[in-house]
């Protein structure tokens, strides 16, 4: 019955989703401020159409929040759905095969920025609610909170939660912003990595210099920066910041055995990424490296002349944006200062170095023995025909740990993305069939949760 409803309403549902995707709600770029408001307002309209009692766009210190609720019984359990309506920048535009903010369905996939992360996935939650509400199947209360700053650190949501604890009070938080192991291998995310993000600025001479007149006599900030960040990771994949691993907890033997049982084709992995070989911390599998171990990566690097042709200069400045994915028990503030101190200490006196931490967040581990998790297991099993595997993933949703800290509530991460969906990259996409299965699985979660509750 659920499947039939989704099939019959597919065209309408997709067009509703596309109305969200067409709004370029890029939180990282200030010139999209009006788009953030437009997207929040559109979410409000769609949630009201889906059947909530009330929906409102609420102010925060940054981009607005979208809050909605459907209260069937004040004494019943309450599920709070969290999602985000902001998206990553679409650049570089020239690498897209379609227009990033003009969604199309091609080869069975939705192609657009936000098709997966997180408009497509949040919309799964909204349409699942629409179904159970319309068919009088909702036996617990539902609340929704969608923010517009997840991709830039969720700095406004923590204070908003603190201010509106009673409004957001719930028994479990349901999130669709993660991935499956494979389209036919369901999984529930039981762990997220934390995050720390910095910008480094290296300054040398007071202006760009002629590379013939000054080359070999003056330190080149670009060369220095490359050396500084290149020295951070050793050939064994270890990160060399002193004290970086102090709070890293090793996975247990049982956890490592579970990870080893997860289907993973290394050759297919390399082929899908277009790489000849993998790299990472020696002694750990790829899945362990991305879910159980911390990482360090350059996210952006720029300096000097970047136009067409040649310009022989020693640049005055060089910049890098770097991130570190952290594991539970690592404190992003502690790591943040540790990295700042390290670069200031090792930088040569031929340049000056400025390291600024831009944002960060804590990791999260979800228990697998509480009622909502069991309901999610059965929700997946009803649609995919097999029990989902519990997995930790490499991404970060820092606000999840904040929810637990401020509301005392656990989260269940029912994600429906795939690695091949290219989130944060050109040609982001979402398989339509998997998207529809997601709606079915979330509907079944709610039905199973009522049995548990």
Where would I find each of the regions flagged by the language model?
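An extended, acidic, His-containing surface patch that forms the Zn2+-binding/catalytic region
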Residues: 49, 182-183, 240-317, 328-338, ...
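A short core secondary-structure module
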Residues: 159, 215-236
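A common structural junction motif
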Residues: 85-86, 232, 236, 341-350
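Flexible glycine/proline-rich, aromatic-decorated loop/lid segments
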Residues: 187-203, 417
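Acidic, glycine-rich active-site loops and adjacent beta-strand->loop/helix elements
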Residues: 85-87, 109, 145-153, 176-180, ...
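Active-site metal-coordination/substrate-binding segment of hydrolases
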Residues: 76-143, 437
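N-terminal helical capping/dimerization or prosegment-like subdomains
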Residues: 1-93, 317, 334
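Acidic/histidine-rich catalytic neighborhood of metal-dependent amide-processing enzymes
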Residues: 110, 116-191, 453
């Amino acid at each position: 019955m659920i499947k039939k409803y989704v099939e019959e309403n597919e065209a309408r549902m997709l067009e509703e989703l596309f109305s969200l995707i067409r709004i370029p709600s890029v939180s990282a770029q200030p010139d999209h401020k009006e788009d953030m408001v437009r997207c929040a307002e559109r979410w409000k309209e769609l949630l009201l159409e889906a059947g909530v009692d009330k929906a409102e766009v609420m102010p925060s210190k940054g981009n607005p929040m979208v809050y909605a609720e459907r209260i069937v019984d004040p004494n019943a359990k309450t599920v709070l759905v969290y999602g985000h309506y902001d998206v990553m920048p679409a650049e570089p535009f020239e690498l897209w095969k379609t227009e990033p903010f003009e969604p199309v369905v091609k080869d069975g996939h939705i192609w657009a920025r936000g098709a997966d992360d997180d408009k497509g996935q949040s919309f799964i939650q909204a349409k699942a609610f629409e179904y159970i509400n319309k068919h009088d199947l909702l036996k617990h209360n539902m609340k929704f909170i969608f923010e517009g700053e997840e991709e830039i650190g969720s700095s406004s949501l923590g204070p908003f939660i603190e201010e509106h604890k009673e409004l957001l009070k719930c028994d479990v938080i349901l999130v669709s912003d993660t991935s499956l192991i494979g389209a036919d291998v369901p999984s529930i995310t039981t762990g997220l990595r934390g995050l720390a993000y910095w910008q480094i600025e290296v300054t040398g001479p007071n202006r760009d210099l002629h590379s013939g007149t000054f080359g070999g006599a003056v330190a080149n900030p670009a060369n220095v920066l490359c050396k500084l960040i290149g020295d951070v990771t050793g050939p064994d994949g270890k990160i060399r910041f002193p004290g970086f691993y102090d709070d890293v907890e090793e996975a247990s033997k049982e956890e490592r055995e579970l990870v080893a049982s997860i289907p993973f084709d290394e050759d297919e992995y390399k082929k899908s990424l277009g790489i000849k070989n993998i790299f990472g911390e020696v002694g750990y599998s790829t899945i362990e490296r991305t879910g159980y171990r911390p990482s360090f990566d350059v996210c952006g690097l720029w300096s000097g002349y970047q136009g067409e042709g040649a310009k022989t200069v020693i640049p005055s400045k060089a910049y890098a944006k770097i991130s570190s994915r952290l594991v539970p028990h690592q404190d992003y503030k502690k790591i943040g200062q540790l990295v700042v101190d390290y670069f200031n200490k090792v930088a040569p006196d031929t340049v000056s170095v400025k390291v600024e931490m831009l944002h960060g967040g804590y990791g999260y581990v979800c228990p697998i023995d509480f009622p909502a998790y069991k309901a999610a297991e059965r929700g997946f099993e009803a649609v995919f025909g097999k029990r989902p595997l519990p997995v930790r993933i490499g991404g970060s949703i820092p606000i999840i740990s904040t929810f637990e800290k401020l509301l005392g509530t656990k989260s269940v991460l029912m994600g429906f993305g795939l690695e091949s969906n290219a989130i944060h990259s050109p040609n982001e996409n979402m398989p339509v069939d998997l998207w529809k299965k997601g709606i079915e699985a979330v509907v079944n979660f709610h039905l199973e949760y009522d049995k548990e509750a």
